[in-house]
């Protein structure tokens, strides 16, 4: 029988994959009231990132500031899904957004995002989860799994 007392197991993955909607994961170290006023949007131009942003709309609308986080310039993203396009779209809607592009190797993505979240005093992250096949995630690991194991800030994920 698997151990389900921590998020360091299969339960969060199964919840995310089968919930049919967004899941707000709150790290065990989180204390205080949940009032996300500074939101980090992990953006790679994917369908999952767009869906996560759409699912976070109630939080985004109430935020004091948003920061779009892209890794390595979101390599290979078409212009219509770029971080610049996202920033312009949200700014047109009157939302207070900035962007940060960070460079990281595949194995450092999750720690780099969490470090940036701390630097920017982010109250919540928004991201897609498990965007690669189960085989790919199983063989190479994944940002989602690493994030679930080490998150330091509440994170809204969508699959």
Stretch-by-stretch model annotation:
Residues 3, 72-74, 131-133:
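A short, flexible beta-alpha/helix-coil linker loop
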Residues 1-69, 150-159:
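Intrinsically disordered or low-complexity boundary/linker segments at protein termini
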Residues 92-125, 129-136, 145, 153:
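Structural beta-alpha unit
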Residues 2-3, 77, 104:
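Residue-level marker of alpha-helix boundaries and capping positions
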Residues 9-11, 81-84, 114, 139-144:
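Charged helix-capping and loop-helix junction motifs
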Residues 14, 58, 85-88, 115, ...:
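Alpha-helical scaffolding segments of alpha/beta enzyme cores, especially the outer helices
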Residues 36-37, 52, 77-82, 110-112, ...:
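Short, well-ordered secondary-structure micro-motifs
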Residues 45-96, 100:
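Redox- and metal-dependent alpha/beta enzyme cores, enriched for Fe-S-associated oxidoreductases
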């Amino acid at each position: 029988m698997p151990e389900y007392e921590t998020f360091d197991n299969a339960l969060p993955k199964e919840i995310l994959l089968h919930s049919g909607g967004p899941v707000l994961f709150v790290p065990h170290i989180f204390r205080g009231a949940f009032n996300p006023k500074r939101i980090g949007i992990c953006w790679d131009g994917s369908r999952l990132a767009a869906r996560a942003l759409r699912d976070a709309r109630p939080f985004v609308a109430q935020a004091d500031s948003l920061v779009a986080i892209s890794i390595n310039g979101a390599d290979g993203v078409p212009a219509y899904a770029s971080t610049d396009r996202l920033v312009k779209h949200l700014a047109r809607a009157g939302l207070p957004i900035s962007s940060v592009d960070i460079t990281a190797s595949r194995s450092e993505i999750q720690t780099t995002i969490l470090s940036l979240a701390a630097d920017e005093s982010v109250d919540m992250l928004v991201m897609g989860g498990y965007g690669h096949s189960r085989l790919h995630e199983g063989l190479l690991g994944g940002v989602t799994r690493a994030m679930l194991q080490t998150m330091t800030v509440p994170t809204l994920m969508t699959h």
